[in-house]
Each structure stands twice: as structure tokens, then as C-alpha cells.
Amino acid sequence: QGGRNAGSDAEHAAADYLVGVMKDIGLADVEKQAAQCDRWQFNSASLTIDGKDYNVYTYATASTPAEGLTAEVVYVNKGTRQDYEDLDVTGKIVLLDIDQRNDWWITYPMLEAMHQGAVGVLAANVGGFAQIADDALNSQDICGPVGIPTLSIGVADSKEIQKLKAGSVSATMKVDNEVEIDAGTTYNITGVLKGKSSDHQILVGGHYDVHFQGFQDDNCAVGLVLAMANAMVKSGYQPENDIVFCLHGAEEWGSSYTQYDWTVGAWEMINHVHPEWVGKTLAFINFELPA
């Protein structure tokens, strides 16, 4: 299912690959620049009901025990406080509908479920994101604590599980998520097209961490940035000022227990790794969702 999250093995492997590509292009001063982040290593997730495996994907939330957790599934509509009236979900897995564009982020129903005593969350994106098909899954930054295991499930599968609710439905959820606080390193990859002067610079960039396969967000941007760099080098063009091609890590997510958990790689770059870029940088041409 992909996933190249902040500080993960996959993100580090991609960083090494991008360093090689920038060197092959012929950029100068190619560097893999370390920045601090929380680490999210997603290894696996599964959901099984009556011997049937359902396709699921995780958020940057807690793991289950290695053997998984088995509990009754309770449908709670949108998972608001009012939706729990007359329900006891203590020790149970809640199934809920969510529209993260028009209502609220996954953080809120996850925290409410935890407050109500639930041990896990299954969230079906009925609006907003993941609308390309009724089996589409979603992942977002969590903007809060790791909480309890929280999985995205397709709308069609959610409806199927709800139909099973004529009787008690028991599910086994397994989530292997390593979310480690202050224990991660992300890398920002830079290469320079030298200008006539290095007193100032222009940044051209995007981010290379992704949810799933990341075609649109943001692998297309990575390809665009590298293609621009390659074309400029091959043309023999020399700009007036340095052009720094910068590919950031830890953009989608990079920190727990905060609502400011995204763009961590870029924030670390300008605040801690290269604070001297403030005042030196004329422009940052950032590519996001360019497809």
C-alpha cells in the first residue's frame, strides 16, 4: 500500500536515491541535510471479520498488541458526543463516517472514541477526501496524540459491516505502527545550480514523503523539480543568483501531540538547519499537487 512517512526506512531510502539523481544530473553541492522529527514507521495493518480480510490503512496513531485486538464493532454515525448517547462502547471498536473537508479532521472522532472507552476506530470517508471510489482509503496527519489504533476503511466495506449488525459483529484489528516521539530524523535533499553570484538564491522544491504511492502528492512535484534541474544543467544556463533545488521530507506529518504536525522538514530547514537563508532567499517556487 506504499507510504513513505517521516523518519521511516522508506523515506530514508528515497533520500539516498534522490541524492544519487541530483549528482547524476550534475548539480553542485548535493547534500542530504538532517532535520529532527518524530518517526512514523508503518509496517502493517489488517482487519478480519468472520474470516474475511478487509482492506484498511492507518493514521499516525497507536499500535495494537502484536496478536491484535478482538472486540465488538459498534457503528456510531459521525462519532460525535451526541452519537454516543445510550451507547456503551467500552472495550469496543467503533465504526464511523467522516467528511474531513466539510466537518472535521480525523483527530476529533478518534479522541472522542478514546474518551468514550473505545479501543479502536474504523473511519469511512463518506465525503471530502478519498471520493474516487467506494473502496478508496485515506490517510492524513493526526494533529494530536497517537491515541488509539485508527484505520481508514472503504465506504463499501463499511456499509457491508453495518449490514452484519443484525447480530453482534466481532472484529480482529492488527496495527503495527511505530510512532516515536523526538526519535526521528528526516532529510532535506539539496543541489545547487551555481549562479553568477551566491549572495542571494532562489529555491525550487517540493516534498518526497507520501501517503500511499503519492502520485499526485507529491511525486509529480519531485519529478518536475528534477526535470527542471536537468534541463537547466544540460542547457548550460547560468542564472544571476544560485538556484537551490530542495526536496523536503516530513511534509505530510512529522510531529505528534500538536496541531502543527505538518511541513516539519521545511520548518526545521529554515529555522534550524539554514537560518541564514532568511533574507538571502529571493523566492521559493514550491510545487504541490502539480498533476
Walk through the language-model features, giving the residues of each.
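Loop/turn elements at helix/coil->beta-strand transitions in domains of secreted/extracellular proteins
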Residues: 25-29, 89-94, 116-121, 168-170, ...
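Acidic/histidine-rich catalytic neighborhood of metal-dependent amide-processing enzymes
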Residues: 101-102, 106-108, 112, 188, ...
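Structural recognition of the beta-strand scaffold that forms the well-ordered cores
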Residues: 31-32, 75, 93-97, 120-124, ...
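Sec/Tat-exported extracytoplasmic proteins
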Residues: 1-6, 18, 23-29, 98, ...
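Noncatalytic luminal/extracellular "stalk/propeptide" segments of secretory-pathway proteins
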Residues: 1-93
